Amino acid sequence: MTQLLLPIIYLAFISLGLPDSLLGSAWPTMYPQLGIPFSYAGILSMIISLGTIVSSLNSDRLTRALGTGRVTALSVGMTAAALFGFSVSGQFWMLCLWAVPYGLGAGSVDAALNNYVALHYESRHMSWLHCMWGVGTTIGPVVMGAALSGGLSWNSGYRYIALFQIALSAVLFCSLPLWRKRPDAAPDGTVPKALTLPQVFALPGAKEVMLCFFCYCALETTAGLWASSYLTLVRQVPAQTAASFASLFYIGITVGRGVCGFLTLKLSDDQMIRLGFAVLGVGIAALLLPGTQVFALAGLVLVGLGCAPIYPSVIHATPAHFGVQHSQAVIGIQMSSAYVGNLAMPPLFGVLANNITPALFPFYLLVFLVLMALMHRQLVRKTAHA
């Protein structure tokens, strides 16, 4: 059953990434056709993020009641419906309505699948599965670009991705008997407990892992959003070169996770996390070096490579840190804190850059790296004695 389920889970992780990059790639075409301000993309992004936060916080109870297979199939079906809704929408308010199931579906499947893989598969699969998420985020804009360059509308790009999600949802529903044969209980037979939020927060190390995830996602999203502007405005890198290296940041994360899958054969999750911190530190230091642009460009790629092992390794270590009976609940709050970091921290840097200077970019990343490293150290210490 393990070998039969694994390809389905890989496909599910690709499907998680497909919608994540669609809005950004389609928005330059969408907003003039809809007759709305450019900034309204932030409203849609906020609605989607709030939906993912809500569903992540409730993923523990949902997964306990329905099982990982049903939650995954229903959630992918929900996102498929939302994407199809986007494809037939001609007004902004319609997009806002469809953004609600879009976010709710994404949060539930993210938390449920991550916990299932952490319980049942080796660390290398967690790295490779998150690499597949990166593949999905790469395919999404390619599909949208192909639709637009072929003379079709942005609605068609969303429709193509929706059809893929609908097909995957059908595969997931057909695979439900496989999930039943591989129950959500851990290999030792331990059944996860449903916990209230106060009970989760009271677990030793829970606050630390939440802050660790918050800082990681704040750093990753801020770097991805503002790196090109920093290179252009502060380091005088030509705009085209800066844009290319900004894309290499995400390629670095995706390729890095593929490589990290092999490194996990020799290194533990906590060692992989510390390795990521070290590479991140070198990358941020390179961004700070004055003079030649080469250091800044290389630093950005290193920041992407440093990010690669952290997210999947923190998730995979959750059952070891908190116990398999608590892992689903803890991963749910990890996901929600990650989305809060994604939602709040990149705009905050925009305010700082606008009112002070964009040269604060590497220092802003450094604050999150230091805090993340401190929280991880506290997490390991507290859970070792729990």
Question: Which role does the model predict for each range below?
Answer:
Residues 30-31, 62-63, 143-152, 231-232, ...:
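Interfacial helix-cap and linker-helix signal at transmembrane-aqueous boundaries
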Residues 55-67, 256-269, 353-354:
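Helix-to-loop junctions at the C-terminal end of transmembrane segments
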Residues 54-93:
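Conserved MFS/SLC helix-loop-helix module at the cytosolic interface between two early adjacent transmembrane helices
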Residues 35, 67, 88-93, 236, ...:
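Helix-breaking motifs and short loop linkers at transmembrane-helix boundaries and internal kinks
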Residues 321-358:
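A late C-terminal transmembrane helix in Major Facilitator Superfamily
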Residues 129-180:
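Helix-loop-helix hairpin linking two adjacent transmembrane segments in secondary transporters
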Residues 98-132:
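Cytoplasmic helix-loop-helix junction between adjacent transmembrane helices
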Residues 23-24, 204-247, 251-254:
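Extracytoplasmic gate region of multi-pass secondary transporters
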